[in-house]
Amino acid sequence: MKKTILIIGAGFGGFWSALSAVRLLDQHDRQDISVQVLAPVAELRVRPRFYEPQVHTMRTSLTQLFEATGVQFIPGLARQIDVAQHTVTYQDTAGMTATLGYSALVLAAGSQLNLPDIEGLQAHAFNVDSIEQAERLETHMQRLAALPDTPARSTVVVAGGGFTGIETACEMPARLREILGADCQPRVIIIDRGQSVGASMGTAIAPVIAEATAELGVEWCLSSSVVAVDEHGVTLADGQRIDAATVVWTAGVRASELTAQV
């Protein structure tokens, strides 16, 4: 009976796992093992760059590559892993439930942005966790020019001072000037629980981060957190109010729920 290596996820981890597997199988002339990839779409999405403009360009189709290398792509979303039975239950593109068997399983489902139960967060904040969410942010920013010229219009609050938060914040001054004009006076504020700039990055790189953000005019609000978001801005834990037309949430990620099943 032919064996199957099933890979959940078509991101960088799943993509390279599939190519590595077919390469090794070819080197050892193993015709008795197939490689399958289960993911919602056969696309490689460059997630670390979703904070940039023109986010729709940050993806490429994997269909031809999978076909050329003999990888079988199965469109669907994995829902449950049964380790004892060596099966994966998934939802296909029609919304129907189906099951796949496997001989070996590679879980490369990645992580998701953590969205805590904060008042107004999901309704009023943006994020760059997926292309779809990043496109929503981009559309919103393009519409800023139609809003009244107030300080809030040119203010962006970024919640979270990790890699994604810093990269997003550093991109914003230039984006605001491009959209609102060279005379725009952007205000970009990173809200972070840490007690020092770039605390989560380590002490060695912190001075570099502090210098780079200062040169761009990015502010830091340290030892603080967002407790509420509305259409006009945020409220911080100490009661401080920041009016901002744009709020971007980047504070933390969590592993795929599938990891608890293996």
Where on the chain are the PLM-derived regions?
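Short glycine-rich anion-binding loops that position phosphate/pyrophosphate groups of nucleotides
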Residues: G13, G110-L113, V253-A255
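FAD-binding core/adjacent interface of flavoenzyme oxidoreductases
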Residues: K2, V71-T155, V248
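Short acidic/His/Gly/Ser-rich catalytic and metal-binding motifs that mark active-site loops
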Residues: L44-R47, N114-D117, E257-L258
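Beta1-alpha1 glycine-rich phosphate/pyrophosphate-binding loop at the start
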Residues: M1-P75, E167-S200, V248
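Short glycine-enriched, charge-decorated loop/helix-capping segments at active-site entrances
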Residues: R49-V55, Q122-F126, A204-I205
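Rossmann-like NAD(P)H-binding beta-loop-alpha module
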Residues: E138-P186
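Conserved N-terminal Rossmann-fold NAD(P)-binding element of oxidoreductases
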Residues: I8-G9, L107, A159-G160
